[in-house]
UniProtKB/Swiss-Prot annotation:
Tissue and organ distribution: At stage 15, expressed in the anterior/superior eye field and the caudal branchial arch. At later stages, expression persists in the retina and in the caudal branchial arch. Expressed in the pronephros and the tip of the tail. Beginning with stage 35, expression in the brain is localized to distinct subdomains of the anterior prosencephalon, the medial mesencephalon and to lateral domains of the hindbrain.
Localization of this protein: Nucleus
Keywords, alphabetical: DNA-binding, Metal-binding, Nucleus, Repressor, Transcription, Transcription regulation, Zinc, Zinc-finger
Chain positions covered by the region annotation Ctbp1-binding: 413-417
Organism classification: Eukaryota, Metazoa, Chordata, Craniata, Vertebrata
Biased composition (Polar residues): 1-28
Chain residue ranges for the region called Leucine-zipper: 379-400
Transmembrane intervals: none
GO BP term, pick one: putamen development
Quaternary structure note: Dimerization is required for DNA-binding.
Organism of origin: Xenopus laevis (African clawed frog)
DNA-binding stretch(es), residue numbering of this chain: 495-585
Name of this protein: Forkhead box protein P2
UniProt remark on domains: The leucine-zipper is required for dimerization and transcriptional repression.
């Protein structure tokens, strides 16, 4: 009976499809009505209906399969016919639900689903179950991974904490070991050893204090000597005769210095405030060596008394200067709101804050002492360098004094700077002058117009600053002059002391193939000399003028264009012709020699007169020196009057023979100085051949000077 009912349901499945559609439509309508009506909350939703339909279909399918299995043993033919309609169902899907016979009969009677629909539903349910299983497995894997990551992070954090704790423990152990080692290595010293160490420190401090005092005395004496040279103060001859080396020995004895040191710094076992207070006196003592140079000009009696009364007066002068600094808010170590202690540069708003900073940061300690020693070494190095430079300057001045250049008239007055420098040189070389000091003068140079000048505007109206041309005077090659001073001419706005022809020749000779175009010559001028980087129109015109004027420059046409070369033979011939061309010029050479000697003597007299205030005040000028100056003055005026009256004087009309006793090595007169005015000797008679050459060369240079 069960088999027949199953076959009937299968055969009539096509007829009941319409009924199924109507049933589903009714169910949908019911679900819509359930949604629309909010009052009937007991109605079944569409999801529950679908679930119920699936369960019913599954139950029906299971029942059919059971029937087919039971009937398949009896009728294999019917089993073969119904094999395409069988739906494979897994045992996992069959086990969970249990269908009662009554429910199975109701499903069969109602004929809700066809076998095809049942098969489709079973496949869908299998797919859904597979997806659920996959999702569950994926979710489990993710949870396991997250759990593993959390465990790993916790383990890493624990390991890091353990490592940090171990490192801290190791550091603490190392520190403890180091402290123990230090305690073992440095046992408590014996009281006698402590006293010895304190005595050694005190002795070192005393030695350092003595060095500072000696340096301060030297600086004060040097400043006093500078003021004495300039005539600002006067010292009796009894004191001026004292040598400089004996002055620093006029200080305190070692016992007095030690007592003074104890008064300033106190006992060595005092508190830090006392030490800092002692450091204030030290710093003021150190700084007073430089502040005394600035305040001594306004108050020279202070330095004068310091030399007379010894070191005690020096300390009192320093205290006075420090009080003056506090009132005037001026200190050598303080300027523009910044501490000028070496390597400090701390910003201080006012002078009081600077004093606090000076007492706190730069007290008497090892660091400040080391910095002071470094500063002493710096000063010593500078003094050594200064002495070398002074020796070089003295050699240069000696050389220039023995080989003076030809005097060139100019409306400009004498150069005061060179005069002061030569006067200092004469003071240093004079046997009666004061000993040479190793420091530069700190006071400004004052105009030396306190006495009557030997060279007056009425006697020599056209004597000016003398400009030398080394390459033309002594036949020194230009490269030897430019090579040592290459960086100077390259960076300084100073005109090189050479003619344009000499510079052009040097530019061409420095090139690889000994030939340059005009633009290359221009570039050499601007590259080598900073002076020619301005006023290009003026000096370029002069370069073109000299290239076309002189025969030693040859213009050559080649593939590149027009280049300029140098005919060295013509260049040397041109230089030799400038001496032998004019007989009148040769005739005037003795007169020029005499005039040069007279001018050299007059310069010496003027330099001697520039130091007359010092000599007159110190009593070092004797009658013989005054007589010599008067004789030189008369000889100079006589020689100048003779030259003015007879411009073409001969060698027999030269000045007196004692002027020739001055070892003057004079050079022949060269008429190639474009930027220098012509000599007084050549104003009366000069070569007409060279006159045209000079006018052509001086025209562009006059524009350059303007």
């Amino acid at each position: 009976m069960m088999q027949e009912s199953a076959t009937e349901t299968i055969s009539n499945s096509s007829m009941n499809q319409n009924g199924m559609s109507t049933l589903s439509s009714q169910l949908d309508a019911g679900s819509r009505d359930g949604r629309s009506s909010s009052d009937t909350s007991s109605e079944v939703s569409t999801v529950e209906l679908l679930h119920l339909q699936q369960q019913q279909a599954l139950q029906a399918a299971r029942q059919l399969l059971l029937q087919q299995q039971t009937s398949g043993l009896k009728s294999p033919k019917n089993n073969e016919k119904q094999r395409p309609l069988q739906v494979p169902v897994s045992m996992a899907m069959m086990t969970p639900q249990v269908i009662t016979p009554q429910q199975m009969q109701q499903i069969l009677q109602q004929q809700v689903l066809s076998p095809q629909q049942l098969q489709a539903l079973l496949q869908q349910q299998q797919a859904v179950m597979l997806q659920q299983q996959q999702l569950q497995e994926f979710y489990k894997k993710q949870q396991e991974q997250l759990h593993l990551q959390l465990l790993q992070q916790q383990q890493q954090q624990q390991q890091q904490q353990q490592q940090q704790q171990q490192q801290q423990q190791q550091q603490q152990q190392q520190q403890q070991q180091q402290q123990q080692q230090q305690q073992q290595q440095q046992p408590q010293p014996h009281p006698g050893k402590q006293a010895k160490e304190q005595q050694q420190l005190a002795a070192q401090q005393l030695v350092f204090q003595q060095q500072l005092l000696q340096m301060q005395q030297l600086q004060q004496q040097q400043h006093l000597l500078n003021l004495q040279r300039q005539g600002l103060i006067s010292i009796p001859p009894s004191q001026s005769a004292l040598p400089v080396q004996s002055l620093p020995q006029a200080g305190l004895s070692p016992a007095e210095i030690q007592q003074l040191w104890k008064e300033v710094t106190g006992v060595h076992s005092m508190e830090d405030n006392g030490i800092k207070h002692g450091g204030l006196d030290l710093t003021t003592n150190i700084s007073s060596s430089t502040t005394s140079t600035t305040t001594s000009k306004a108050s020279p009696p202070i330095t004068h008394h310091s030399l007379l009364n010894g070191q005690a007066s020096v300390l009192s002068a320093r205290r006075d200067s420090s009080s003056h600094e506090e009132t005037g808010a001026s200190h050598t170590l303080y300027g523009h709101g910044v501490c000028k202690w070496p390597g400090c540069e701390n910003i201080c708003e006012d002078f009081g804050q600077f004093l606090k900073h000076l007492n706190n940061e730069h007290a008497l300690d090892d660091r400040s002492t080391a910095q002071c020693r470094v500063q002493m070494q710096v000063v010593q190095q500078l003094e050594i360098q200064l002495s070398k430079e002074r020796e070089r300057l003295q050699a240069m001045m000696t050389h220039l004094h023995m080989r003076p250049s030809e005097p060139k008239p100019s409306p400009k007055p004498l150069n005061l700077v060179s005069t002061v420098t030569m006067s200092k040189n004469m003071l240093e070389t004079s046997p009666q002058s004061l000993p040479q000091t190793p420091t530069t003068p700190t006071a400004p140079v004052t105009p030396l117009a306190q006495g009557p000048s030997v060279i007056t505007p009425a006697s020599v109206p056209n004597v000016g600053a003398i400009r030398r041309r080394h390459s033309d005077k002594y036949n020194i090659p230009m490269s030897s002059e430019i090579a040592p001073n290459y960086e100077f001419y390259k960076n300084a706005d100073v005109r090189p002391p050479f003619t344009y022809a000499t510079l052009i020749r040097q530019a061409i000779m420095e090139s690889s193939d000994r030939q340059l175009t005009l633009n290359e010559i221009y570039s050499w001028f601007t590259r080598t000399f900073a002076y020619f980087r301005r006023n290009a129109a003026t000096w370029k015109n002069a370069v073109r003028h000299n290239l076309s004027l002189h025969k030693c420059f040859v213009r050559v046409e080649n593939v590149k264009g027009a280049v300029w070369t140098v005919d060295e033979a013509e260049y040397q011939k041109r230089r030799s012709q400038k001496i032998t061309a004019s007989p009148t010029l040769v005739k005037n050479i003795p007169t020029s020699l005499g005039y040069g000697a007279a001018l050299n003597a007059s310069l010496q007299a003027a330099l001697a007169e520039s130091s007359l205030p010092l000599l007159s005040n110190t009593g070092l000028l004797n009658n013989a020196s005054t007589g010599l100056l008067q004789a030189v003055h008369e000889d100079l005026n006589g020689s100048l009057d003779h030259i003015d009256s007879n411009g073409n004087s001969s060698a027999g009309c030269s000045p007196q023979p004692h002027i020739h006793s001055i070892h003057v090595k004079e050079e022949p007169l060269i008429a190639d100085d474009e930027d220098c005015p012509m000599s007084l000797v050549t104003t009366a008679n000069h070569s007409p051949e060279l006159e045209e050459d000079r006018e052509l060369e001086e025209e562009p240079l006059s524009e350059d000077l303007e």
